[in-house]
Swiss-Prot record:
A Gene Ontology cellular-component term: cytoplasm
One Gene Ontology biological process: response to nitrosative stress
Protein name as catalogued: Iron-sulfur cluster repair protein ScdA
InterPro entries: Hemerythrin-like, RIC_family, ScdA, ScdA-like_N_sf
GO function terms (MF aspect): metal ion binding
Principal location: cytoplasm
PANTHER family (UniProt xref): IRON-SULFUR CLUSTER REPAIR PROTEIN YTFE
Origin species: Staphylococcus aureus (strain MRSA252)
Cellular localisation: Cytoplasm
Subunit-structure text: Homodimer.
Protein family (similarity comment): Belongs to the RIC family. ScdA subfamily.
Summary of the function given for this chain in its UniProt record: Di-iron-containing protein involved in the repair of iron-sulfur clusters damaged by oxidative and nitrosative stress conditions.
Gene designation per UniProt: scdA
Length: 224
């Protein structure tokens, strides 16, 4: 049974669908997930701890036996999973979404300056993530695999610390985009492109939170 003293990130690791519940009440299970459920709930207004625990335990009870839980994968298999489930889809989404973000800023930015700032923040986020993922694929992940295989990797802790620092910076950019868009709620007058951009940015946020959680709280723990 999940209780108030359980660590938020650990709950999501054990029961991935719990991420949806934490997300719905604004609790960070990603870079800020190393706190108890009770402590996290106290930081949020209008979060009833007992109700939250009830919802989480419903997820625990309905957890499907035999369904893939990445925490049971070894390092090399987990890396392959991360690359196929997150790196490849993120690259594709950046390629497809960027023209819409640019169009939104160009067409509506003159009357809504925050959309210009949104594009600038998105570009920083996108470029940072693309560089980060490429470095992981080319340099960092091979080091983690070597470490798993018993080879000496002198800078393994530095590798992990640097990646976590990148993730924190990524999280800050996601917060800024959410704030600029009022949690991705388009105004009444928003056109189709506007609504499309907000919808897909929100989905991008969800995907990135899951991605970072899996690396910070599952992958890196296997090699630290």
């Amino acid at each position: 049974m999940i209780n108030k003293n359980d660590i938020v990130a650990d709950v999501v690791t054990d029961y991935p669908k719990a991420a949806d519940i934490f997300r719905s009440v604004g609790i960070d299970f990603c870079c800020g997930g190393q706190v108890s459920i009770e402590a996290a709930s106290l930081e949020k207004k209008n979060v009833d701890l007992n109700e939250l625990l009830q919802r989480l335990n419903e997820v625990e009870q309905t957890n499907t036996p035999g369904s893939l839980n990445p925490k049971f994968l070894n390092v090399s298999s987990l890396i392959q999973y991360i690359q196929s489930a997150y790196h490849e889809p993120l690259r594709e989404e950046f390629k497809n979404l960027t023209p819409y973000v640019t169009k939104l800023s160009k067409v509506h930015g003159p009357n809504h300056p925050y959309l210009v700032e949104l594009k600038e923040t998105y570009d920083t986020f996108k470029n940072g993530m693309l560089e980060h993922m490429q470095k992981e694929d080319d340099v960092d992940f091979p080091k983690l695999i070597k470490y798993e295989q018993g080879e000496v990797v002198d800078d393994i802790n530095t590798v992990i610390d640097d990646l976590v620092s990148d993730h924190i910076a990524t999280g800050q950019l996601l917060v800024k985009m959410s704030e600029l868009t009022s949690s991705y709620e388009p105004p009444i007058e928003a056109c189709g492109t506007w609504r499309l951009v907000y919808q897909r940015l929100k989905a991008l946020e969800v995907l990135t939170h899951e991605h970072v959680h899996l690396e910070n709280h599952v992958l890196f723990k296997k090699v630290s």
